[in-house]
């Protein structure tokens, strides 16, 4: 699972997921999976989608993961009263804004890439679309 090796602080504020994304262009591969909606992806969801894509292309070509879960999410244990401090870090998430390229792929035909991204998109909680690299 993806998570930072070390962070400056163990826990962070909840914050808000506003604004537009950085990294909106396909830059490494030829095809990409771009987020249309806004939300957050857990490390498990990112890994599940990656596995689905890898199996679909039968380990051909190359896949790039363009998102990294760098925000810790805390939870308090079951049946614990409110207060007494912030809970423990349970999992890590990546905040996603519309337009962010989540995955990229190269070295496979377009039809196979579309099918692989369709399988990956089913594992994700946000709406996505298929994009190709624009050559100027």
UniProtKB/Swiss-Prot annotation:
Swiss-Prot/TrEMBL GO biological process terms: translation
Coiled-coil region list: none
Keyword Ribosomal protein carried by entry: yes
GO molecular function, one term: rRNA binding
UniProt KW keywords: Ribonucleoprotein, Ribosomal protein, RNA-binding, rRNA-binding, tRNA-binding
A Pfam cross-reference name: Ribosomal_L16
PROSITE patterns to which the protein is assigned, alphabetical: RIBOSOMAL_L16_1, RIBOSOMAL_L16_2
Organism domain of life: Bacteria
GO cellular component: cytosolic large ribosomal subunit
HAMAP family: Ribosomal_uL16
Similarity remark: Belongs to the universal ribosomal protein uL16 family.
Subunit structure, interactors included: Part of the 50S ribosomal subunit.
Function field: Binds 23S rRNA and is also seen to make contacts with the A and possibly P site tRNAs.
PANTHER family: 50S/60S RIBOSOMAL PROTEIN L16 (PTHR12220), LARGE RIBOSOMAL SUBUNIT PROTEIN UL16M (PTHR12220:SF13)
Stated name of the protein: Large ribosomal subunit protein uL16
Organism this protein belongs to: Edwardsiella ictaluri (strain 93-146)
């Amino acid at each position: 699972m993806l998570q930072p090796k070390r962070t400056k602080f163990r826990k962070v504020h909840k914050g808000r997921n506003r604004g537009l994304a950085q990294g909106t262009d396909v830059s490494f591969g030829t095809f990409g999976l771009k987020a249309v909606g806004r939300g957050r992806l857990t490390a498990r969801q990112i890994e599940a989608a990656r596995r689905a894509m890898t199996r679909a292309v039968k380990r051909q070509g190359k896949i790039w993961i363009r998102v990294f879960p760098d925000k810790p999410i805390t939870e308090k244990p079951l049946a614990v009263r409110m207060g007494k401090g912030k809970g423990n870090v349970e999992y890590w998430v990546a905040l996603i804004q519309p337009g962010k390229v989540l995955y990229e792929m190269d070295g496979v035909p377009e039809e196979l890439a579309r099918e692989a991204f369709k399988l990956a998109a089913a594992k994700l909680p946000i709406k996505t679309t298929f994009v190709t690299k624009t050559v100027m």
